[in-house]
Amino acid sequence: MSRSPLSFLLFAGLLMSATATAQCPIKDSIMSQIDTPVVDGTTGATEHHHPDGVTGATTPMQGRSNDKKKKHHKHQDPDHFHQFRLGGYGEAVAAFKDYGINRFYGGADGNPRTHRNTISIPRFGLALDYKFSKNWILSAEIEFESGGTGQAVELENTENGEYETEIEKGGEVAIEQFHITRLITPTFNLRAGHMIVPVGLTNAHHEPMNFFGTVRPEGERMLLPCTWHETGLAAFGRVGSRAATFDYQVMVVAGLNANGFDRNTWVASGKQGLFEEDNFTSPGYAARLDWVGVKGLRVGASYYYCHDTSANSDKPSYYGNMGRAPLSILSGDAQYTDRYVTARGCVVWGNLAKSDVISSRHGRHSNASPYSRVTPVAKNAMSCGGEVGVNLRNIISCPTMPELLPFVRYEYYNPQEKVLAPHVADQRLKTSMWTMGLNYRVGNGVILKADYTTRSIGGGRFNSENEFALGIAFTGWFLKK
């Protein structure tokens, strides 16, 4: 590992944090039904705090002042609903870049020097909650990515096992969440259906108000599915009291598919969902624990394990008698916020057994396969990153000033942190990057963003990649009753 990531790990241990707008991904709707005082992560006051039952994160409450610690009840809480609510979030980004579209075909210097501009709608999501009763809640979220419709792929066993694509377009429409929650007690509740896998910081807090940049942190989404959502069963709750308060979540879901693992994104493309049914031969097990007992601070750890990713292949014959290919992912993250500063950070480390065998077998993918044949797949992958922003209005103590938050972010990631022989790691995947920018919180859930990013590739051996971006995003509830 280079000196940069080592230095950053020390830096992250002191700085890692995040906005209290998404303080706790597992409290969910339980507090909307059970009047248990909890610590407000923004002010530190004890309040009836109502997390978001759709995303599992606390809904951003833009425009609410954090200057006063005052108690509020259900009828005063703008996030509370009696039976139904409909909301969503969305992002639009324009970027101005000085590099080409592929650093792997730009010659010995990496990405060629060129100027190009892009504009996109990375995602637009619609979310709803419906209460069948005070203890049974239906939650759903549909996300539109890149403004288009995805594709359905079928494996036609009657046609020599060939892949058949039914519909094709540049973007994707996905059911990101669809689950039913049974509220039992503050310490134990159950959920079944399609839900977010809360591994890493970004998956647990993926709405645009919960990161400063115009786009999501790059390191996590280059290694892990993002947003990572699977079908299964979960238990969650809150235990302890005062400074010893913890939120937990454990789940069993459809495991990742080794067919999708590749050189550039490690296991990020291994998420199932290409087919009409997911393989559940080797489930994935995920757990998350958050310490939320101190004012404005949340420290969390998450773990994911799949006993045999090759068993979830749609064509198990790819892997023959290679044996199990277990996958482990460990993540630590922390969040801190007060009136003046917001900081967040995350470290992700992953280990894939039999990565050398998987790499050699991926050459068997047919040309019609939806999977990449770009190898080798690494044994270990790593990402670490953090960002810090300050609220100028509160620092200057000028209530009439616009709410401006300058920020800086650092990230290091490498989807080929360690590659097994005889394969060799590609240094063009080793990335260190700085992002600096400004957020303008317009209010009522709307935010304007601007940032500049510079990437150092392969420890500076290849051409840097630089870009300036502008973005606009929103998060909020449109209808409640």
Cite the ranges covered by each PLM segment.
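Solvent-exposed loop/turn segments connecting transmembrane beta-strands
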Residues: 118, 145-148, 225, 277-279, ...
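Outer-membrane beta-barrel pore domains
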Residues: 97-101, 113, 163-168, 178-181, ...
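Active-site glycine- and acidic-residue-rich loops that bind
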Residues: 226, 276-283, 322-326
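N-terminal periplasmic/intermembrane-space "pro-region" immediately following the signal or transit peptide
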Residues: 20-105, 481
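Loop-centered beta-sheet repeat module
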Residues: 260, 266-312
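Outer membrane beta-barrel
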Residues: 77-97, 115-258, 281-286, 290-298, ...
